Amino acid sequence: MDNIQIKHQEGIEFLKNLDDNSVDLILTDPPYLISKDSGMNKFVKEVAKLDASGENKKTEEQWIAFKAKKGYADDKYKENYLKYGNTSGNKYAFKTDYGEWDKEFTIEKLDEFIKLFYKKLRPGGTCIIFFDIWKLETLKKLMETAKTKKCGFRQIRFVEWLKTNPMPLNQSVNYLTNCREVALLGIKKSKPTFNSKYDKGVYEYPIQTGKKGERHPTQKNLLLFEDLIKKHSNEGDLVVDPFLGGGTTAFASKNTNRRFKGCEVDENYFKIIQKKFSRNNVVLNTNSINI
């Protein structure tokens, strides 16, 4: 039997083919529904347009006046101010468009996934879903009603990933907004696997790095996922992720001696996962990876 099975397939279709009550751990990172919520993408285009025309540029005289107004003691921000008209440089217009896979995702679709998560997990199985911090209350309600309007996941807990090397967005304006990501954890019925004690559910790991062109825009740290898998499952258990992205959950499962089944709907990222596994002399098929 193959211990690692990955398909190029849509997530709902993939989950429906799994046996009910067969999964020990679902560890996943669905679209956060943030691309459509933000006006930042329009702002990014406007900034690029102004940069190209040179309309953002400032003069030496303007810098001197700006420096005096702000009380700056040195010229640390001078280059950015002269070129972009602001002290942060053009990075302040950080893009929040993660692609069609986020734009086309909906709360209704997420609800459909969560109901299937509950159905496929064994009693005592654990579900961990990373999601937008500002929408956690919505996620919590969906998890609590995964079976019926009054029945669903129990023991809902908060998991936090503190990034040790966050991008310095608006670093001189306010607290860093992108230094953490969060997940909610739920149990199907009772008696979950939990290989830890007195655990705060807070993890400190850096942003995952990788080869150019192979990183997913929302990729999670491999050691973080290995840690979560070891705490919430045992060796030989089945881990599932229907939003595989760059393949982190699959590699973390392989590294911790768990069985894994997952899928990725985006053809480009599925090919990236294939490329990563091919470095380990794995024989690959067009639409699946079996190890």
Residue ranges and their predicted role:
Residues 122, 176-177, 182-192:
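Core SAM-dependent methyltransferase catalytic element
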Residues 1-167, 178, 195-291:
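S-adenosyl-L-methionine-dependent nucleic acid methyltransferase catalytic domains
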